[in-house]
Each structure stands twice: as C-alpha cells, then as structure tokens.
Amino acid sequence: MDKMKDLLEMMEASKDDLPEIYCDMDQVLCNFIGRAEEVIGMPFAKFGKDDRWIKIRDTKDFWANLDWMPGAKRLYSFIQKYDTHILSAYSDRDDNSRPGKKKWLKKNTNIKPRNINLVKRADKQKYATTDGKPNVLIDDYKKNIV
C-alpha cells in the first residue's frame, strides 16, 4: 500500500510541475470562419473587412452560436482535465464578441470563469509564462506560436 501512496504523491507533485494550458477559441474550438462565411455569403477573405464585420455584428448571437471545429470536442475532452485556460482575442469591431464568447464557453464547456482570458491579440504574449515557467498555447494563428 505504501508504494501506491508514493505513486499518488509523485503524480500530485508532477501535476504541479505541468505548464498552464491556454487554448484559443476561433478556429481551434469554434468554427468562426465557417459561420462568418454563412453570414456574409461568400469566402471570408474575399469580402471587405468593414463590410464583413458589419454583417457579423448585425447577426444576433453570432459568437454564442458558433459550431465546434472538427476534432475540437476531442481536443477539449483531453485538455479540460488539466484546469485549462481560454486565451482568445476579442474583436474591437464587434462589442458582442466578448459576451458572446463567454456565452459559448458557458454553453459548451466547463471552463471556470476565472480561467477565461479574452484579450487583445497583442496581449496573448503576456501569457507565455507563469512565475517564470513556460506555458502551452494551443492556437491556430502562426504569429502567436513560438
């Protein structure tokens, strides 16, 4: 029995040594582009930036009702065991972005509210370390990945 206790104590100690996991939402958990293309009626990149954001902003509950990305439920089922954090950029072009993303998370995940970080894209780098230890960021945007 002492060996089992030792093993469990070692597992707890190693849990404390794990990096924080930060997961993005758009194009990682949620299919932002797919829904945006439905709303604007054409490929996202081919529609003018201002015009596409007007359409997104004018779509009721756009953010709260995004579909899961293919494979994202499987990813989430794995990472949610590790007190995962959300690190997602909000849109300055749509005031509904932050509250809508929070609604999506509440409806689709069990992420603790204190672990939800909706920030400006440039601020994501501030989450690279915690107390000098490197963290893990799951993100689709290459500029956010080292």
Regions found by a protein language model. Name each.
Residues 24, 87-89, 138:
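Short hydrophobic segments within beta-strands
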Residues 87-98, 102, 106-127:
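A short, structured active-site edge motif that brings together acidic residues
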